Regions:
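N-terminal single-pass transmembrane signal-anchor helix
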Residues: 43-78, 88
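Detector for intrinsically disordered, low-structure N-terminal pre-sequences
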Residues: 19, 30, 37, 69, ...
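Surface-exposed loop/linker segments characteristic of extracytoplasmic
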Residues: 2, 65, 76-373
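N-terminal leader/signal peptides at the extreme start of proteins
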Residues: 1-49, 111-114
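General helical secondary-structure elements
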Residues: 15-19, 24, 33, 40, ...
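A ubiquitous, low-specificity "background" feature that marks scattered single residues
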Residues: 24, 28-32, 39, 57, ...
Length: 373
């Protein structure tokens, strides 16, 4: 009886064990099947909206950091090209001085003519320093074709010179200039076109006439010896030895952007004027100035301005006064200038005004070290 009961209990235990084992196996298989379903479920790729916004924000920050650096690098390259243009012009200046035993005149004018301009005594031919440098700028054809050789009575105004004086040359244009780069119609002081609307090529480079207004003081004088103290003026003929203040500390050429006023490379048309552009035309103190300012600028102080304002006025580069007869560039912070020795430097718009006055004259006796400006 006991043995029989033991067998029954043993059999029941075996059945129970098998059921538990089967349930465990089924659970294990179910778990594996669930994992398989999770592992092999198809997934979707792409950005969430938040991730996309983060990426856009990062790109915006990078652009904000890099763009000013890129723009600064471009301006640096343009400023270097501008300086290279000035060096090329100064090399031609010294070639002219070597060949002709003098630097070119600021512009040529026969002040003895009866048809001279009554305000400034300007008259033909009006040939400017830029045109006089043509043979030394690998533009000998321009000089050869200039009708002044054939008929000096009209010079720049000669009908045969219309296409010649309207040409544009890259070495007369600053790549940073924001103004027009096309030829412009020469107008009188009131804004009326001269000489049947003759056009003349632009220049972003001007010569330094010194302290005084290039067209003179009241009354205008045929001989400028008493008032001209810069290297270039009407019928000037200075040589290296004329610059007793030192060639390395005397400004010969500088910038004048066409976004301020009209400047020409070929020369002066008697009775014409340099007019401010629309950007500056309404600024106080800005007005058209007489023909000489088409190729020349001054630093001040000038007798005419002192008489007008009651005090001396200096015009450093990029001066807020924006005088059409001053050096002015579209470079941030200042302008390039070329010294008599051919060196080019960038002059700050915050240069000491007395220093700027001193480096603008050729023989005022002031000694300026290169580090002073």
């Amino acid at each position: 009886m006991i043995k029989k009961n033991f067998l029954i209990i043993q059999k029941l235990g075996f059945i129970l064990f098998n059921r538990v084992r089967n349930r465990s196996e089924n659970s294990r298989l179910a778990a594996l099947n669930a994992c398989s379903r999770v592992i092999f479920l198809p997934t979707r790729s792409g950005f969430t909206l938040i991730e996309l916004l983060v990426v856009i924000a990062i790109i915006g920050v990078l652009i904000g950091i890099l763009l000013p650096a890129v723009q600064q690098a471009r301006e640096t390259a343009r400023r270097m090209q501008c300086g290279s243009n000035l060096r090329q012009l100064m090399l031609a200046m010294h070639s002219h001085e070597s060949a002709q035993r003098q630097f070119p005149a600021g512009y040529l004018s026969d002040t003895s003519r009866s048809d001279r301009d009554s305000n400034t005594l300007d008259a033909a031919p009006g040939t400017g320093w830029g045109l006089l440098l043509a043979p030394y700028l690998e533009e000998a054809a321009v000089a050869d074709n200039f009708a002044q050789v054939k008929d000096p009575s009209q010079g720049v105004l000669h009908p045969a010179n219309r296409s010649l004086v309207a040409q544009q040359f890259q070495f007369f244009l600053c790549p940073s200039s924001a103004g027009d780069q096309e030829p412009f119609v020469v107008k009188d002081i009131s804004g009326n076109p001269l000489a049947d609307g003759i056009e003349i090529g632009r220049s972003n480079y001007v010569a330094n006439a010194g302290h005084e207004e290039p067209w003179g003081i009241f009354p205008a004088s045929a001989s400028w010896d008493a008032i001209a103290n810069g290297p270039f003026y009407r019928n000037s003929s200075i040589r290296n030895k004329s610059v007793t203040d030192g060639m390395s500390t005397t400004v010969f050429l500088g910038e004048h952007t066409s976004s301020l006023s009209e400047k020409a490379w070929a020369g002066v048309i008697p009775g014409g004027a340099s007019h401010p552009t629309h950007k500056f035309a309404t600024r106080i103190g800005t007005a058209a100035d007489h023909a000489a300012t088409l190729v020349l600028v001054h630093s001040g102080p000038a007798a005419a301005e002192t008489a007008l304002y009651g005090y001396e006025v200096i015009h450093p580069p990029n001066s807020p006064a924006s005088h059409v007869c001053q050096m002015y560039s579209d470079h941030p912070g200042g302008a390039n200038v070329a010294n008599g020795d051919g060196s080019v430097r960038f002059v700050s718009e915050f240069i000491n005004q007395d220093v700027w006055q001193y480096v603008s004259s050729i023989a005022d006796g002031e000694v300026i070290s290169s580090g002073a400006w």
